[in-house]
Amino acid sequence: MKFKIKLVMSRITMTVLSVLILISACTSGSKTGTNRQLPVYLDESKTIDERVEDIIPRLTLEEKVALCHAQSKFSSPGVQRLGIPELWMNDGPFGVRSEVLYNSWTKAETTNDSCTAFPALTVLASSWNMELASQYGQALSEEANYREKDVQLAPGVNIARTPLNGRNFEYMGEDPFLVSKIAVPYIKAIQDNGIAVCVKHFALNNQE
């Protein structure tokens, strides 16, 4: 039971961290024209820990629960009264996928629905080139920004253990040392461009 509680609180904290990044982007450089003091969670001069500690008590239980799950295929709800915007995610590791409708996998066919089909991560890893991994992440995040995404559901770091796994192409091979080396510059490049990353998968997908 304690583990479940800790897991839920961890998910809430990570979600709040993500929305604070969005709030920072929305409030950066803005001027209110008043002398009212910003709440701590909106104050970019405060540490992330301080901002998280300030905003969590402001959230109702219902709002905390809502932040922990999706409202559509690739978005989570915000909290309008606190200025927390919606969180828009993209899947996956080697490109910005085509848009789908809100609650179905039907193609949305929007006008900005364009992207580059980057080489699979297995190909990237086979280069053993850390600089190339950084350039890969940089290019991917540029397209994610263009498509107004907040979180990249990537990279895939599961270790290839069986050739029957239908998702091996999302991963970086069977060598955990190589995976750890390639994933880091990939992640940093995406984050440096203002996009959060969601490293996956937590469990079981080695055999999927």
Describe each model-derived feature in a short phrase.
Residues 1-9:
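N-terminal secretory signal peptides that target proteins for export/translocation
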Residues 13-24:
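Bacterial N-terminal signal peptides
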Residues 25-208:
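Glycoside hydrolase catalytic-domain context in secreted enzymes
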